[in-house]
Amino acid sequence: MKHSKKIIFALLALAMSNTSMAAPMPLDRVSVQINDGIILESEITNMVSTVKANAKAANQTLPSDDALRTQVIERLILTHLQMQMAERIGLQIGDLQLDQTIENIAKEQKVTVAQMQQTIESEGTSFSQYREQLRQEVTLGEIQRIQVQRRIQVSPQEISGLVKLIQEQGLKDVEFQIGHILIEVPSNPTSEQLEGASRRAEIVLKRLNNGDDFRSTAIASSSGPKALEGGIWDFMNINEMPTLFAEVISNAKKGDIIGPIKSGSGFHIIKVVDTRGLQTQEVEEVKSRHILLKPSPILSEDRAKAMLANFLAQVRAGDADFAKLATQYSEDPGSAAKGGELGWADPSMYVPEFTQTLASLQEGQYSEPFRTTHGWHVVQLESRRKTDATEQFNSNRAHQLIFRRKFNEELQNWLDEMRSEAYIEIVEPESKRG
């Protein structure tokens, strides 16, 4: 896994992992009811303990136990709601797809699966526990993609407008790492509530300007989506980030703290944690063709994989034509009619597993069957070429940037809607009851 991804996992993902892996406490109780599901006190306790341990190892200051507990409960609530949604629509990550994901992670780390397993177990986690946590992470990613993607529309006018801007900027990309703190206000707030939130935001801003640690302050004070990660968003192009960020940081420099900025959800404080510039010169494109089979109640995962393996054997033996097989069997409507041809494309435009597989192939080589979010594939890399960034590339890039920005915004809207429609009851410990 790339270094940046490891950083993202440092507090939250590792905490979630250890939460699900820890042995049950001898005495436990229901701390939160979410629809027909529950969060046990042991889940909260284990996650809080892990966050504290990770913070101590990183020499990071944490807020009060109550503030940290609130953030942990909120994250667990959102996780459980998403997993409940996945269960309702029948979304399951099978072992074959999980194995493929683990193989891809090992390739990114340039190790074998056995070496990766040895490293994980040396850190005190069984490989079976790691697999189940990874299964949950993949499920969360899938349910977010399924539910949020259909809410997003990118118009030709938006694309052409951004293409023009990109061309005016000479394809110069600058990425920002943003720190974000949200002092939330309720729906339809009173003037007193607005004034109170505004005062709290000014106090937080003053503390930050006086040198308080941003991450610790965010964990203690923020109601934003990245609060438990210290309010830190990963590097984003200005066209990818939420509109609120983009409107205020275009002229900011590293270290600047901006705010408070009022919106419908509250008062925002934004810090430019870091910046980096990207210079694009030549772009490598690939020409490929593939066959896609989608598992279903009729076609099992094993059967789909076996069919593709059989197709490959026939093609390699000269007994079948790849293009004809693609036309007859492929379930990708966009390419099946063209014999599976995907044409020339920037490989980063594909889903990660597809991109990684193409990167591992020589020209003319066929892949073995592999799994992506779309189903099971075999792909042939026909050719590679270096090309300047063309107008079509700019258009694809513009669509990608706009989509990512809207995805980030719609993801938070979807989570908020799910939470507002759910039955949630937080049961306080007896020691805190009046």
UniProtKB/Swiss-Prot annotation:
PROSITE patterns: PPIC_PPIASE_1, PPIC_PPIASE_2. It comes from the Bacteria. Its main location: periplasm. Its EC number is 5.2.1.8. GO terms for biological process: Gram-negative-bacterium-type cell outer membrane assembly; protein folding; protein stabilization. Residues 173-274, 283-383 form the PpiC domain. InterPro entries: OMP_Chaperone_SurA, PPIase_dom_sf, PPIase_PpiC, PPIase_PpiC_CS, PPIase_SurA, SurA_N, Trigger_fact/SurA_dom_sf. Pfam families: Rotamase, SurA_N. It is found in: Periplasm. The keyword Cell inner membrane does not apply. Residues 1-22 form the signal peptide. It catalyses: [protein]-peptidylproline (omega=180) = [protein]-peptidylproline (omega=0). GO terms for molecular function: peptide binding; peptidyl-prolyl cis-trans isomerase activity; unfolded protein binding. Coiled coil: none annotated. Gene3D superfamilies: 3.10.50.40, Porin chaperone SurA, peptide-binding domain. Chaperone involved in the correct folding and assembly of outer membrane proteins. Recognizes specific patterns of aromatic residues and the orientation of their side chains, which are found more frequently in integral outer membrane proteins. May act in both early periplasmic and late outer membrane-associated steps of protein maturation. HAMAP family: Chaperone_SurA. The PPIase activity resides only in the second parvulin domain. The N-terminal region and the C-terminal tail are necessary and sufficient for the chaperone activity of SurA. The PPIase activity is dispensable for SurA to function as a chaperone. The N-terminal region and the C-terminal tail are also required for porin recognition. This is Chaperone SurA. It comes from Shewanella frigidimarina (strain NCIMB 400).
